[in-house]
Amino acid sequence: LLKCNVKFIFEGEEEIGSPSLEAFCRTHKELLEADVILVSDTSMVSAETPSLTTGLRGLAYWEIEVTGPNRDLHSGHFGGAVANPINVLCKLMADITDADGRITIPGFYDDVEDVSHAEREMIAQIPFDEAKYKAAIGVDELFGEKGYSTLERNSCRPSFDICGIWGGYMEEGSKTVLPSKAYAKVSCRLVPHQDHEKISKLFEEYIARVAPAYVKVRVTPKHGGQGSSEERSVG
């Protein structure tokens, strides 16, 4: 018999940002009080390597809407004279990271602690086959922030991703349209000490500052969460 109480929480909204979880935990704070919390939504290094996860990256998520003309236009009549919202959106998104994989938003790295020498040594000891990793996901080359290994990039460093982008004509065949609107859903993975609300504000201010005057850009925050990291033995 266990000599302690065990409480289970089964939560099915994780993929949409867990909109109900925080309020539930606040309402039932006393019921959920515990000395140790174990999260099962993590992965193993490999099928042969037992893993204990001591930290997770946080998240900030937005939807972006770029509006140009008041309706879809014919590119033969208006192309080159009116800004194309999809072109503008692609340029805005492409400029958020530089050629070295670093995020260009001013202030973004202010609260980021670099990977320590001890952490790098510990990560380097993890059994990791880069060739198998690439083969499993079907890519020939990997890309990420310069100066960091693959395992450092996907665990200890922040990142920016376009999760979805759309606009204009997307049916079969072709249509020479200059679209009225373009949309994107984007996210940043954050590391501990990066506050997702602060990052969200920095992102919104950055887009407002660099967006050209010939389109209207609206940024809508969707959800976010703090990264976490626990004390661990290194060496």
Protein language model annotation of sequence segments:
Residues 45-47, 61-63, 67-235:
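Metal-dependent amide/peptide-bond hydrolase catalytic core
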Residues 12-14, 33, 55-68, 86:
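Internal, well-ordered domain-core segments that constitute the primary functional module
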Residues 1-55:
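Acidic/histidine-rich catalytic neighborhood of metal-dependent amide-processing enzymes
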